[in-house]
Amino acid sequence: MHGADSIKACIGPLTSSPKLLELFMKVMSDAEVWRYDPFTERSMWNPALFQKKKLRVGYYADDGYVTPHPPVIRAVNEYLDKIKKLSFKHVEIELVPFTPYDPSGAVHIISSLYFPDGGKELKEELSSVGESLTEMSKMALNNPSVQRFNIEELWKAHTQRDTFRWNLMHEWTKAGIDMLITPVLPGAAFKFGTCNYWGYTAYWNLADYTSVSVPYSSVKASDKPVEDFKPRNKLDAEWQALYSPETYEGAPLSIQLIAPRMQDEVVVEALKLFSDIN
């Protein structure tokens, strides 16, 4: 929607290898697109951002709000174990547990800022061409955080967004990490119309941080549900109820690498560094 920049969107490349991703980023940087697009920030590609003798890598498999399905936790832990076992030239890797700042609050803020008009324009555009809302769009619009803001309410929501960013930066700096490893979703590739939580990526959209996702592993028959699962909240219970290894066996899983804003080089170089993990 034109003019709706409470949460800015960008187009991310989809490539078949870390080297092709790096090539794309270099080409876009060398093209100096900021000379032609007033909404693009000046940023020269600088791999030196990654040139450290020691890299502190934060991680979490669970955001503390919605519990991932068992194969996701297994995949993240496997990925971390392989990092520990690999020998890297010229760099020492230190893995550091990280607790994300206020994930439930982040989901509330970004859910409201996706549709600051309460979804009015989206519904009107779909109606004008005879299209109906998909199940995923219905879930997003029916979120209790979605409302039509007046200008004072929008300013307040922007202040909440900015306060979240300040507090997250404080936690990140206090942890002393260079980058972070997390799940992309708290589940595998999902059945159409069933995904009701995307906070593991939306969190970083709200933060305006850089991330790259990489496929890793898939659901196995041995990834059994947690017995006597005790949900933290209603959403946690609903999410966990979606899972069974019979339904998801073979479905792909993904890991994401995250770095602060304008540090794309860090995640691309890390992806290259970890490219032997499979």
Model features per residue range: what roles?
Residues K26, K52-V57, H108-G118, L126, ...:
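Preference for well-ordered, secondary-structure-rich cores of eukaryotic proteins
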Residues I73-N77, F115, G119, Y197-T201, ...:
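Amphipathic alpha-helical segments in well-structured domains
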Residues V72, A106-D117, F190-N196:
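Short glycine/threonine-rich loop-to-helix capping motif typified by GTGT followed
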Residues E41, A61, F98-L113, M136-R148:
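Flexible, acidic loop-helix segments that line cofactor/substrate-binding pockets
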Residues T67-D81:
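Aldehyde/semialdehyde dehydrogenase
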Residues M1-Y60, N77, K82-K84, S145-R148, ...:
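Structural helix-boundary/capping segments
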Residues K89-T99:
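General small-molecule cofactor/ligand-binding pocket signal
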Residues A61-P68, K120-P231:
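Serine-dependent amide/ester hydrolase catalytic core
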